[in-house]
């Protein structure tokens, strides 16, 4: 349980054995409509010391926003590509949203498949990625809560109102 959404989300991820990295390389590739929103997530992760990798379009948006990023090929663009990095154990986290286009869906499938086999955490929505990012930032501050005490506090509030 968490008091904030981010805290609850991180605890839910940890409880289901989803790994939230504290360092390493992160791959980000998002559809055009998500690029502006992905910038804030990328900036936060870069400030935490993560090395960011992205496909050309996402990398261009990140570079324009002043974020350091390394370009990696899509699967269809040839090797070396992101699936190679995943299989080599080089990627800690993946943020990938796709447009409804056959080649994008095919690339996304191969990335998801490699990530699943390598047990790399993978987010397909910016909401999930944002919550994970906030969780990574605040992970050191996670607390255990006594449910009985919280129940008493809620009852006291009800009585007071």
Q: Which sequence ranges carry the predicted segments?
A:
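Extended, alpha-helix-rich binding/interface surfaces that flank or overlap catalytic cores
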Residues: 125
């Amino acid at each position: 349980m968490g008091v904030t959404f981010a805290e609850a989300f991180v605890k839910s991820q940890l409880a289901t054995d989803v790994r939230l990295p504290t360092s390493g390389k992160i791959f980000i590739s998002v559809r055009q409509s998500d690029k502006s929103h992905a910038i804030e997530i990328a900036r936060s992760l870069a400030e935490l010391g993560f090395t960011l990798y992205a496909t050309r379009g996402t990398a261009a948006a990140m570079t324009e926003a002043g974020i350091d990023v390394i370009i990696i090929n899509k699967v269809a663009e040839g090797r070396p590509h992101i699936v190679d990095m995943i299989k080599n154990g080089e990627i800690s986290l993946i943020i990938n949203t796709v447009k409804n286009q056959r080649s994008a869906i095919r690339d996304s499938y191969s990335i998801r498949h490699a990530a699943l086999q390598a047990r790399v955490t993978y987010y397909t929505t910016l909401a999930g990625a944002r919550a994970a990012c906030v969780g990574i930032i605040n992970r050191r501050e996670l607390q255990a809560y006594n449910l009985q005490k919280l129940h008493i506090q809620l009852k006291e509030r009800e009585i007071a109102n």
